[in-house]
Every structure is written in C-alpha cells, then in structure tokens.
Amino acid sequence: MPMFQPSKNGGFDGHILDLHSAVKDGVLGGGDGKFLVVVTDEKKKLDLKEMISELELPEIPSVFICPISLEPMQDPVTLCTGQTYERSNILKWFNIGHCTCPTTMQELWDDLVTPNKTLHQLIYTWFSQKYVLMKKRSEDVQGRAIEILGTLRKAKGKAKVHALSELKQVVMAHAIAKKTVVDEGGVFVISSLLSPFTSHAVGSEAIAILVNLELDSDSKAGLMQPARVSLMVDMLNDGSIETKINCARLIGRLVEEKGFRAELVSSHSLLVGLMRLVKDRRRRNGVSPALTLLKSVSVHKQVRNLLVRIGAVPQLVDVLPCLDVECLESALFVLDSLCLESEGRIALKDSVNTIPHTVRLLMKVSEKCTNYAISILWSVCKLASEECSSLAVEVGLAAKLLLVIQSGCDPALKQRSAELLKLCSLHYSDSMFISKCKLTRTIQ
C-alpha cells in the first residue's frame, strides 16, 4: 500500500500524544480540523483489517505505517526507544535473535512492548472515516446507475443516447457501477438496443458499456445473434476509432465463448475492417485489438481462406517492422496459420518482404516470434526450395539459424532450425555454404 511522505518538519516524529489535537490539526482529513465522526454499534464495529484491505488509498499518513513491513499498523506497540511497530512484526524481529530497535539500531535495555492505544484509536478512526465515506459514495454510485438504467428502459431518441452516455461515464469511473449494471439486468437492457435498425450513435455507446462489463455465457449468447454481430461489424468499419476498438474487443470476447460459430466471423467486411485498423499508421491504438481478434479467428479454415483472398498476407508482412513485441507475436501467429492453406503459402512466397522481414526477426524479439518466423520460412522454402532458400541465405538466414541451434531455445525449435538449415544448404557447394554461415556479417 502506498506510503505518505512525511512533512519536512518531521511530522509527529513517531509519537501520538493527544487524539483530539491530532484530529484538530487535520491528520484525519484535509487539515481544517473537520472530520467525520464515526459512530458504530459495538456489535457492528468495523473491522480494521477488513477496512485496510478494502480501501485502496493513494496516501496514508506515515505515522500509521510500520517501519518493518511498510504496511498500516493494526496493533501498534511502542519500544523503550519510543519507536512504534506492528506487534507481530516486532515480535518476529525479536524471535530471530535481534535485540536492537530496527529503526535506530539502538541496543534495547528493555524488551517490553507497550500497546500504543492512542495511535491505535487514531488509526482506527482515520480508516473508519475513509471507509464510511467510500461506502456512502458506493451507495450513491449504485443508486445513480440504477436510476439511469430505469431511464434507459423507457427513453427514446436523443434521450436514449444521453442516458447511455451517462451510464458509460458512471461505469468507466466506478467498478461498483459495473457490478450494479450487471446485477440489475442492465446487460439484457443494453444488448436489446442492438438491432439492424440501431443508429450508430446508440450502438457505439451501448458497445462501449458492454465491453467494460463482466458478461456471463447467457449474455454472450444473446450478443452472438447474427444481427447484433452484423451491427458490430458495420460500426467496426464506419465508427470512430474508439468505437472500432470497442467492437473488436467485444467480438473478441464472443469468439472465446464455447458456442461461438465460425460463420459469424467469416465476413469479408469484418476482416477488411480489422486490416484497416492494423494498417492505420496515424492511430496505432487500434492495432493490438485488431491483431488479437485476427489471431483468435484465424484458427478457422474459412477465415484463413478469406484472409488470403482479401490480400491480408502482404499487408501483414509489410507492417511487421512497425509492431511491438505483443503485436508481432499475434501477426506472426496469423501468418503462420495461413501457411496451413496452400493459397496462404503461395501468397507468402509471392510477397517480396516475407523472407527479409521474417529473417530479421530471428533471435531478435522473443522465442515465440522466432518459432513462428522459422515455421513461416520453412513453409515458403519447402514450397519453392531453390528460389526461396537462396534468397533467405543471402539475407543472413544461415547464420541466424546457427545462432538458434547454439542457443538455449526449445529443443523442438532447434531441431526445426537444423532441418531448415539443411534444406537451405542443398543449393550450395560445401565451401560456399560455409562462407554464407559466417557470423561476422549478421545480427545488427
């Protein structure tokens, strides 16, 4: 938990002398002497440990923090040196043989630990105040989310768009609102707004909410209706960049569902829209969600064939140098999947950048990338051995393969590299191939 930095004048120097003064001086709040008085029934007394675990506070007064664990104290005790620690932590310190104060390193002339009741009360009061305020805000947020859902159920036209926009803001700002929307049947209400006649204004707001909610299997099944997927595809092509990203992410979550049907994503419009996101050089935030969805759908044969037909192979190959590690792994996975189809292998062979771009990635990014790249190179070199192997060797493949073989990579990857190296050597004399394998001209 983050620790509040003490003030330059030393704060309390580790001592709490008077609870009333501490409250008055603003330790419990904003320094104006005002604070929330927490009154609890003894039977319903708030548990300090529970409050600390539930509250995610960016700042906590340093006087509440145990110097050993750097966590808020629940049972503070003070040593003869005047330093205060969490009881369990200081007892562990003593049990391992230490007889000094952890902070000052002074020899202890007395190992007695004295409960610091004043500090404990101050800690309890401070956390209680924060906890009660958090609960009150949560109730306010829940009430607001329920109110907006009620409005949404009967709203029409611009009022519907306004209600969705308000709900989106609440959902994105408060985790409790997401749960409230789900618990109150909001997923069904919002999903029912998606139809062939839905305007993009309504659809984009609805999808922005849905993509931020926890969806169960029934909710996903409802969203997998062809008309709703079709609307998402339309907005992926024609919406704003934020809407396109949300559509890609939401469809990606549906694809993972057990009952998902491949024909729902075997769509020319969907794949073209995703490739537009991948190629968009001005707005790169859409690349990762697009490639992630392409990776998920490329396991289906009909999708692979359609990807080849829309010209995805050279487009994906050409963007490889611009991608980060995560995106590279997804793009190479897709290209490797396309090698399963004869048309895909031909398209990879015919793309002028396939060999130089994939060779350049070997041993440079990650083992996954190296694995996919070698698999792609194997497919194209096997298809046109003399033409592709010679080109690959000329751009440094042989030396890179030797590095893979000598590395600590997976044995199966090293075996595939050895087989590819052997395939490349068939079109050279021994002396010529050995010269091509020299490491001096590789690995920038």
From Swiss-Prot:
One of its GO terms (molecular function) is ubiquitin protein ligase activity. ARM repeats lie at residues 301-340, 343-382. Pathway: Protein modification; protein ubiquitination. Residues 59-133 form the U-box domain. InterPro entries: ARM-like, ARM-type_fold, PUB22/23/24-like, RING-Ubox_PUB, Ubox_domain, Znf_RING/FYVE/PHD. One of its GO terms (biological process) is protein ubiquitination. It holds the Pfam family U-box. Transmembrane segments: none annotated. It catalyses: S-ubiquitinyl-[E2 ubiquitin-conjugating enzyme]-L-cysteine + [acceptor protein]-L-lysine = [E2 ubiquitin-conjugating enzyme]-L-cysteine + N(6)-ubiquitinyl-[acceptor protein]-L-lysine. Its EC number is 2.3.2.27. PROSITE patterns: U_BOX. The keyword Repeat applies. It comes from the Eukaryota. Keywords: Repeat, Transferase, Ubl conjugation pathway. Functions as an E3 ubiquitin ligase. This is U-box domain-containing protein 31. It comes from Arabidopsis thaliana (Mouse-ear cress).
